[in-house]
Amino acid sequence: MARVLVVCAEPIGPQVAGPAIRARELARVLADSHEVTIAAPAPSVTGDVRIALVEAGFEDYDALSAALAGADVVVAQSLPPRLLSKLPALGTRLIADLYNPTVFEVLEAGRDKATAARRRQQRTVTLASIAQLAAASHVICASEQQRDLWLGMMAAEGLVGIEDYSRDPTLRSVIDVVPFGLPSEPPVATSPAPIRAMFPSIAADDRIVLWGGGVWNWLDPETAIDAIGLIEQGRTSGPRTHLVMMGMGRPASEELDAMRAGQRMLGHLTRSGLEGEVVHVNRGWVDYDERGGWLLEADLGVSTHHDHLESRLAFRTRMLDYIWAALPIVATTGDTLSALIERDGLGLTVAPGDAAGLAQAISALLDDPARLASAKLSLERLAPKMTWQQSAASLSAICSNEIATGSPDRAALRRATLAQYPPLLAETHATHGLRGAAARALRNLRRTLTPGS
């Protein structure tokens, strides 16, 4: 039994999104075989009596440092540079969870920023990813496409060890796939049904298409809105088809809130005249344990994105929820999960930006009960194969040291860590002025010079 620390950069509580969901669910699986602690910013709860909690964010250097020192293994999607560089000396093994293709996500997330700020952010995120790869004994990601991305970065940075390759030419022992999983228990319907309780203008026999998550720069809600508008425009009788946006007020999301995607979507919706008629937006965020009621009340799940690299490499949490609830899916082509929809008959896919095609696909499913039932049956068969227990089975063995893993590259870690400071200080200077940048530099210098820090 290993002492495993799971680090999350976001609070873990009733309202969570992808990164916090993954941290909590991986911790739950690992707690079956290990002594597990979660470190996350306050306020957080583990929701599991087997899991200890350290309320510490990345700015809580001393508390997080002590938690790292007390662990045999740390599983983290990211760590601050100073703490990452301490791991080899502590003897704590890092499993870097790179399920999020940050090196491309940052290009979309910062699309509305000035070019200089985007370059600084891109440089920082890229160096942070290199540092994670250099520090890790093992790397996990969510798909084979992501694995190819990180293997390419490792090769370019000289992080493919000859000894590791000689022992395992597949390098699965160094970097492998741990997909985002599903709960083992199916969702439970709630009473009253939450969607119609919030939006009472939706009639009992109307059809609901659910947008099951937030609105970010890399997504394309406008095409979904336009598709619903086309369906309404062509309706002569019978039930209406409504688009329901499940949430916009994502917790712990200062960076995401700064994106203009939500503003653009609301502006587009206002111009369309569809809000309150056939498009409905929850400005809040649905609790993680209550989302099942929303999923079960819907007739279809939709996920649309733009055609870019982030979309090709992403592993959409909302799509996993649709599979969990056996909710037939209409989605944009181009990523891992859209290929799964096509292969297993889970719904239909359309080209990016094709509102007319999306409208046709939605109607093709909703107007054909047999086709809809077939998709639901395929989803019901697939869901038990994608649980967290199955997706993370290898992770427990890695934490137990039952599988030989790679070795951290201390020299590469040192280079990547030091290289992060200039863009980080430049970003601090841009946002907090010279005094803020100087204070950050002094803190880092003090920690460097303090023994054991």
Describe the residue ranges of each PLM region:
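C-terminal amphipathic helix plus adjacent low-complexity
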Residues: 171, 371, 381-453
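Acceptor-binding helix/loop patch of EC 2.4 sugar-transfer enzymes
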Residues: 9, 13, 96-127, 148-153, ...
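Donor nucleotide-sugar binding/catalytic pocket of nucleotide-sugar-dependent glycosyltransferases
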Residues: 134-194, 204
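Short hydrophobic beta-strand element within catalytic cores of glycosyltransferases
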Residues: 300-303, 321-331
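N-terminal subdomain of nucleotide-sugar transferases
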Residues: 1-45, 231-240, 434, 438-453
